[in-house]
């Protein structure tokens, strides 16, 4: 699996993920890019779960973004509906985290679209560790969104055997 973290703070949204791809108990790749930009660089997206499934979902989500002129919530809801009702999509095992200047969302294969109330997303095999670390740092420090995401991912990488320290971080100003 993997760990994806997204943090909103002080006019920035940051999303990061580790680079480990595992097949069972074997590390197959250590430098995968699980966080990327979509829709003309205006949306940051990350995935946890089966890699091939996630790429299919990225393509479908980007199609929904194009169809709805980059409106993140509308595109996410439409993807979730499609994911829930399309037989081939309903078998996909992945989750998406997506963020832009307006919102941060988790999209699940059950058709859920969740906007966390504190702007913090942490998912994947190391998600609980990363969430605990990020929440503590958000509440007790003045660190930047990027510093919080990096620290949370590194803590998850120290604890979770399916998460490594080869990080991809994307950052966007909320004013853009």
Swiss-Prot record:
The keyword Hydrolase applies. It catalyses: ATP-dependent cleavage of peptide bonds with broad specificity. The keyword Cytoplasm applies. Na(+) binds at residues 157, 160, 163. GO terms for molecular function: metal ion binding; threonine-type endopeptidase activity. InterPro entries: ATP-dep_Prtase_HsIV_su, Ntn_hydrolases_N, Proteasome_sua/b, Proteasome_suB-type. Keywords: Allosteric enzyme, Cytoplasm, Hydrolase, Metal-binding, Protease, Sodium, Threonine protease. GO terms for biological process: proteolysis involved in protein catabolic process. Belongs to the peptidase T1B family. HslV subfamily. NCBIfam families: ATP_dep_HslV (TIGR03692), PRK05456.1 (NF003964). This is ATP-dependent protease subunit HslV. It comes from Pseudomonas putida (strain ATCC 47054 / DSM 6125 / CFBP 8728 / NCIMB 11950 / KT2440).
């Amino acid at each position: 699996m993997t760990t994806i973290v997204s943090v909103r703070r002080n006019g920035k949204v940051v999303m990061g993920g580790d680079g480990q791809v595992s097949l069972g108990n074997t590390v197959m790749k250590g430098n995968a890019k699980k966080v990327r930009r979509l829709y003309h660089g205006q949306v940051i997206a990350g995935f946890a779960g089966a890699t091939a499934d996630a790429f299919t979902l990225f393509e479908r989500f980007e199609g929904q973004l194009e169809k709805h002129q980059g409106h993140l919530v509308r595109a996410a809801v439409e993807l979730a509906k499609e994911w829930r009702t399309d037989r081939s999509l309903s078998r996909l095992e992945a989750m998406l985290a997506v963020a832009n200047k307006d919102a941060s969302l988790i999209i699940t294969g059950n058709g859920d679209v969740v906007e966390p109330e504190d702007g913090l997303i942490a998912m994947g095999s190391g998600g609980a560790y990363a969430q605990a670390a990020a929440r503590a740092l958000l509440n007790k420090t003045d660190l930047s969104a990027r510093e919080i995401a990096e620290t949370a991912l590194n803590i998850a990488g120290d604890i979770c055997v399916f998460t490594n320290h080869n990080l991809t971080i994307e950052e966007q100003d909320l004013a853009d």
